[in-house]
């Protein structure tokens, strides 16, 4: 006997965040431009994914589909089985350029987000959330400064604290440390891992830095070049957590994974512009 099942046409149950044959084509004056094509990936809840690939390969295009700022032209992107159709507080984006409100203090930038996204919390609970997140990123002392009174690293700390204070299910990071000096960058990578361990959002992060990806991610997704870019290879990163940078870098598997990534990017999918 054949059982009659409810229709599942609108839902997909593979992975928490699921890319199913995703394509995105942009109309241009010279005709349609196929940016990405046939992207398939299943991300588990709480997983940390880094996406690397050459400039213009479609990394931001992919992230915009997850944030809901744009829609795929073929296939679908699903969160918890539901197609992503618009932006929402369950998915927060942190950009390279901080995007803080310039006239508000660090504290108020975070407080406003908490107020808007978690209105069910009492005023004192909201205050506690803000205090906690300022502390997590080491900005308790500097909380009353405005963005123009903060360093680049401090601004990015505020942006990360603001995103996480909303308790998003998915944290989307678009090259968040790209503009920072090497030391600040390493500090923030470590802070990000500490915060991620606490809240465990699913993370999707674009980076151009192979070492950053190997230190942070559970899996590194490497994209081929466009047009019609797709996922070329996925590296599983085996290092135990919590991670210590020295232990990771000294692990013999680190050099091997690094060589694989370099080989992918600079030999198999070399790009003239890089
Ligand atoms: N709105 C648009 N209209 C036309 N083409 C677009 C549009 N947005 C992106 N593209 C093209 O799609 C391709 C992918 O762009 P995308 O910004 O996703 O790349 P990226 O990998 O994030 O690049 P980068 O590392 O330089 O930020 C590029 O060739 C880009 O020119």
UniProtKB/Swiss-Prot annotation:
Pfam families: ABC_tran. GO terms for molecular function: ABC-type nitrate transporter activity; ATP binding; ATP hydrolysis activity. Disruption phenotype: Mutant requires high concentration of nitrate for growth. It grows normally with nitrite or ammonium as the nitrogen source. Keywords: ATP-binding, Cell inner membrane, Cell membrane, Ion transport, Membrane, Nitrate assimilation, Nucleotide-binding, Translocase, Transport. Signal peptide: none annotated. Its main location: membrane. It is an enzyme of class 7 (translocase). Gene3D superfamilies: P-loop containing nucleotide triphosphate hydrolases. GO terms for biological process: nitrate assimilation. Residues 17-250 form the ABC transporter domain. It is found in: Cell inner membrane. ATP binds at residues 53-60. It catalyses: nitrate(out) + ATP + H2O = nitrate(in) + ADP + phosphate + H(+). PANTHER family: NITRATE ABC TRANSPORTER ATP-BINDING PROTEIN (PTHR42788:SF7), TAURINE IMPORT ATP-BINDING PROTEIN-RELATED (PTHR42788). Part of the ABC transporter complex NrtABCD involved in nitrate uptake. The complex is probably also involved in nitrite transport. Probably responsible for energy coupling to the transport system. Belongs to the ABC transporter superfamily. Nitrate/nitrite/cyanate uptake transporter (NitT) (TC 3.A.1.16) family. The complex is composed of two ATP-binding proteins (NrtC and NrtD), two transmembrane proteins (NrtB) and a solute-binding protein (NrtA). This is Nitrate import ATP-binding protein NrtD. It comes from Synechococcus elongatus (strain ATCC 33912 / PCC 7942 / FACHB-805) (Anacystis nidulans R2).
């Amino acid at each position: 006997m054949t059982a009659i099942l409810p229709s599942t046409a609108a839902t997909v149950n593979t992975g928490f965040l699921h890319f199913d044959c995703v394509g995105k084509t942009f109309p241009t004056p010279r005709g349609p431009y196929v940016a990405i094509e046939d992207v398939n990936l299943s991300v588990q809840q709480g997983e940390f994914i880094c996406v690397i690939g050459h400039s213009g390969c479609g990394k931001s295009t992919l992230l915009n589909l997850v944030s809901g700022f744009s829609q795929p032209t073929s296939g679908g992107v699903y969160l918890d089985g539901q197609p992503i159709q618009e932006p929402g507080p369950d998915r927060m984006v942190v950009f390279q350029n901080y995007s803080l409100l310039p006239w508000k203090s660090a504290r108020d930038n975070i407080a406003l987000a908490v107020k808007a996204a978690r209105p069910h919390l009492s005023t004192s609970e909201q205050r506690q959330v803000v205090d906690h997140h300022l502390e997590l990123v080491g900005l308790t002392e500097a909380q009353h400064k405005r963005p123009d009174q903060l360093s680049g690293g401090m601004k990015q700390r505020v942006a990360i604290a603001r995103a996480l204070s909303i308790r998003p299910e998915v944290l989307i990071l678009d090259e968040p440390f790209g503009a920072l000096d090497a030391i600040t960058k390493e500090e923030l990578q470590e802070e990000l891992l500490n915060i991620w361990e606490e809240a465990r959002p699913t993370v999707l992060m674009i980076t151009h830095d192979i070492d950053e990806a190997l230190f942070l991610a559970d899996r590194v997704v490497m994209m081929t070049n466009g047009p019609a870019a797709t996922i070329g290879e996925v590296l599983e990163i085996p290092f135990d957590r919590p991670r210590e940078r020295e232990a990771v870098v000294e692990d013999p598997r680190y050099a091997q994974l690094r060589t694989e990534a370099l080989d992918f990017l600079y030999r198999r999918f070399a790009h003239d512009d890089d």
